């Protein structure tokens, strides 16, 4: 026999706020130095040429240019920036 009623509505209904992760500037799009390219947990995408990672693994553009996503032989995704011609 149950010793508690099966209601419990006040103990339910909690969920964490979404963290808005993901790619913010896609391949072929222009990025300005300092722009966020990818927000991520861990290193799903790794920094390539002219891209640096913040302490929370967010990838930022180091220079103005076009974003490029590539996969190398190790099957990992790399994000790089091809600078605009001066």
Swiss-Prot record:
A cellular component term, taken from the record's GO annotations: cytosolic large ribosomal subunit
Q: Name one GO biological process term.
A: translation
State the SUPFAM superfamilies in the record: Ribosomal L27 protein-like
The cross-references to HAMAP family, in alphabetical order and at most eight, read: Ribosomal_bL27 (MF_00539)
Family to which the UniProt record says this protein belongs: Belongs to the bacterial ribosomal protein bL27 family.
Species in which this protein is naturally found: Christiangramia forsetii (strain DSM 17595 / CGMCC 1.15422 / KT0803) (Gramella forsetii)
Name one matching Pfam family. Ribosomal_L27
TM regions (residue ranges): none
Tell me the InterPro entries matching this sequence.
Answer: Ribosomal_bL27 (IPR001684), Ribosomal_bL27_CS (IPR018261)
Give a yes or no for keyword Ribosomal protein in this entry: yes
* Keywords associated with the record: Ribonucleoprotein, Ribosomal protein
The molecule here is called Large ribosomal subunit protein bL27
Q: Which N-terminal stretch is annotated as signal sequence?
A: none
Q: Is ATP-binding included in the keywords of this UniProt record?
A: no
GO terms of molecular function? structural constituent of ribosome
Lineage: superkingdom: Bacteria
- Please give the positions of the paired cysteines in each disulfide bond: none
